[in-house]
Swiss-Prot record:
This is Large ribosomal subunit protein bL28. The keyword Ribonucleoprotein applies. Residues 1-22 have a biased composition (Polar residues). GO terms for cellular component: cytosolic large ribosomal subunit. SUPFAM superfamilies: L28p-like. Belongs to the bacterial ribosomal protein bL28 family. It comes from Halorhodospira halophila (strain DSM 244 / SL1) (Ectothiorhodospira halophila (strain DSM 244 / SL1)). Keywords: Ribonucleoprotein, Ribosomal protein.
Length: 78
């Protein structure tokens, strides 16, 4: 399963680990993803989403119906 938030589209980023001796090695910064079920009252069903913590906050603020409408407008199957 890909490490991409379905709401925000956040993907892994890249950067460096930097040691005390200032040695640098490449690393990935992964988004804080969670598999979460949301109850959609209008459709009378559960929807499973893979969302980041920021995506959860967006759903709390705007509501699951508005977020699902935006996702469907982007062509994402939900």
């Amino acid at each position: 399963m890909s490490k991409v938030c379905q709401v925000t589209g956040t993907r892994p980023g890249t950067g460096n680990n930097v040691s005390h001796a200032n040695n640098k090695t490449r690393r990935r910064f992964l988004p804080n993803l969670h598999d979460h079920r949301y109850w959609v009252e209008s459709e009378n069903r559960w929807v499973r989403l893979r969302v980041s913590a920021k995506g959860m906050r967006i759903i709390d603020k705007r509501g699951i119906d508005a977020v699902l409408a935006d996702m469907r407008a982007r062509g994402e199957r939900v």
